[in-house]
Amino acid sequence: MYASYIEMRLKPGKMADAIEMAKQMEADLGQMGMKQFIIVDRGNDNSTVLALYDTAEDQEAAGPKSAEIVSRFMDVIAAPPDRKQVEVPINFTF
């Protein structure tokens, strides 16, 4: 399994707006080949996004659409997101 690991710094007080925007994009996100999409609110207007994919190829194929989706958040993010592509060696579901 592979993941896009994205750290985002939001403009002050914009976390709720970002979460609502992501909820409105559920259909678009579902068409990108990912298996899970997770937003973690780390407090202080910081968040981490995890987008999980079965294969590295699925993750790479989603790149252009991912960039387009991130651009929709430009009104709420304070700095360009830091995106890393990582491997997920363990993902237990209970």
What are these regions (language model features)?
Residues 70:
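Glycine/threonine-rich phosphate-binding loop and adjacent beta-strand/alpha-helix elements that clamp
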